[in-house]
Structure formats: C-alpha cells, structure tokens
Amino acid sequence: MKIQRIVVGYLNTNCYIISKNGKCIIIDPGDEYDKIKNAIGDKKVISIIITHYHFDHIGALKYFDNNVIDYKYKEGKYNIDDFEFNIIHTKGHKEDSITIYFEKEKIMFTGDFIFNNSIGRIDLEGGNIDDMKKSLHIISKYDDDIVIYPGHGEDTLLGIEKQKFNLYL
C-alpha cells in the first residue's frame, strides 16, 4: 500500500491518496482539485473518506463523482476492494470526527483529532472537551508503533503522542 500526502489550501491541509493495485482511497480532499487529480493519475478512485466536515477538509469534494463519496462511515470494520480498515469515532475537535485505522499496516489517519505534538482544537464550532478526553482514552489503548497521519503537519507515532495525552486529561 502506498500513501501520498498532498498539502492543499491556505491552511495546509493534508489530503491523502492511499493506493494499491491501481485503485485508491482519498482522505480529506480539502482544496486544489487539480493538484489532487494530478496525484491520482490513472488510479481508480473507489472511495473518498472525510475525517470531519470542516471546510478545509472538504473543499474539493464537489468536483468528485458522487458515487465514490462516502459521507458518513459508521464505526466498524470495512473491506472495500483491496482495502481493509476500521472507522473509530473520535469526537472532540468536531462531533463528526473519525479516525481511519488500517490495522494490518499499523497506520491511522486522524484528521484534526491528533497532530504531531498536539491534539485538535476544541474551541471551534462542534468542539467538546469531554468528547476529546473520551476519544483520547479510546485511542490510548492502541499500539505505540502505529503511525499517525494527521490532517495538518507531519506524521508521528502514536506512542510519542500518548506521552502527552495526560496534559489534556
């Protein structure tokens, strides 16, 4: 599985293209559709997943075929073509926030829930400190060697970020 990070928009949002066997899943097409489309190349888009519905994560969504956009993944396990992943509801930054966890690959796409050296803001519309604390408790049960791909900034390891969770709990 290949992971491409494309930084888009004036808030430098990370859009991810996860590809395997000529197919791909797009996570958070925040802006700059042409840049994303160029990175996709000739791969077939089989799904678009949004980690949460803030404008900087959905700006280019309107340019994609509605047949591949999955607006509301429910918590649980999914198997789409060659991709297996889990959806974990991680409220706090926003009430609709999710984390996409590829268990076999040991990677998580956290949107604006967890960043490298921080957590998501809770002072924006839809933010909630109690939900954030619950979500941090849930995620803290996962393995330290999981790679976190956040909605902004560089990737990190869950174990590194867990060391800072107590600052927020």
Residue ranges and their predicted role:
Residues I107, D131-L169:
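Divalent-metal (often Zn2+) His-rich catalytic cores of metallo-beta-lactamase-fold enzymes
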Residues M1-I40, T99-G111:
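Conserved beta-strand hairpin/beta-sheet module of binuclear metal-dependent hydrolase folds
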Residues K74-Y78, F83, H93, I107, ...:
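Conserved catalytic scaffold of divalent metal-dependent phosphoesterases
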Residues N12, C24, P29-N86, K164-L167:
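Active-site HxH/HxHxD metal-binding segment of metal-dependent hydrolases
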Residues F85, G126-G127:
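Residue-level signal for the nucleotide or nucleotide-sugar donor/cofactor binding architecture
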Residues Y33-D34, Y53-G59, E95-S97, F115-N117, ...:
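Active-site environment of divalent metal-dependent phosphoester hydrolases
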Residues G120-G126:
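Short glycine-enriched, charge-decorated loop/helix-capping segments at active-site entrances
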Residues P29-D31, Y53, G92-K94, K106-I107, ...:
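Active-site metal-binding loops of divalent metal-dependent hydrolases
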